[in-house]
Amino acid sequence: MATMPGLPMFGHGQVEGFEEKYGMEYRRPYRDEAPDAELVERHGREIFPLLKKRYLFADVERFLLYDFVAPDGSVNENVFAYSNGTAGERALVLYNNAYARADGSIRVSCPYAVKDSGGKKLETRDLAWALGLVPGEGRYLLFREERTNLWYIRRSAELARSGLRVHLEGFGCQVFLDAHEIEDDAFGHYRALHDRLGGAGTGDVAAAIQDIFLADLYAAFAEAAGPALVRRLCERLGAFEPKPAPEEAQPAAEPPTEAKARAKAAPDDAKADR
């Protein structure tokens, strides 16, 4: 609802998870219900950020629906897939309205009516057009999944040719935002990132590229600080281990004087007298 065109309507108590439903004519609720803290937290984490992006979803000028095509070529009617956006920012939404998981791809939109001089005609658009891609060698699409905050990368030419392949768990959804096309640099950074991720996502694109191209340096540091080197250093330092300091000499016992000798013997003399 938060990503569909038009005005989203929230019922009373929907965010809090209240079961009692009543209209504006009610002065007070009949039930004393407590808000569902987990449901409120999920709305704050998953729904409210999308409501702040309503400018991407409210209009219909760029709204397109897609058939979700399964690997066997059939259309999975349980999956809702659509794109929308503005001239400079695009969004793509997929939702699986079933318990069974869904695997498939989207490439071409469903036909929609367009007015022309002779009345109306049906047209379709492909996903590459919807995302503003200019397919070509060395061009890539970067886009972020809102719920997981992971970035994904795909070849623009592959998206135009085969579409976007998606896996959705039962009642799962994916909302892709911040989609933008980039051209690879002379060092092939984005090609290397695409090949390394293999379709998976990353939390930080720049850090992932850095990890790839500094992998040899990281390995050298890891080897330098590895157990073998530490063992050799310990062995080397052990050869020059300082000798323990000699124990301090105890002061020589003072020779007993005649008075001390008599005092020491006094208890024994007292016992003898008894």
Predicted regions, residues:
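Carbohydrate-interacting/catalytic domains
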Residues: A2-P5, M9-F10, Q14-R274
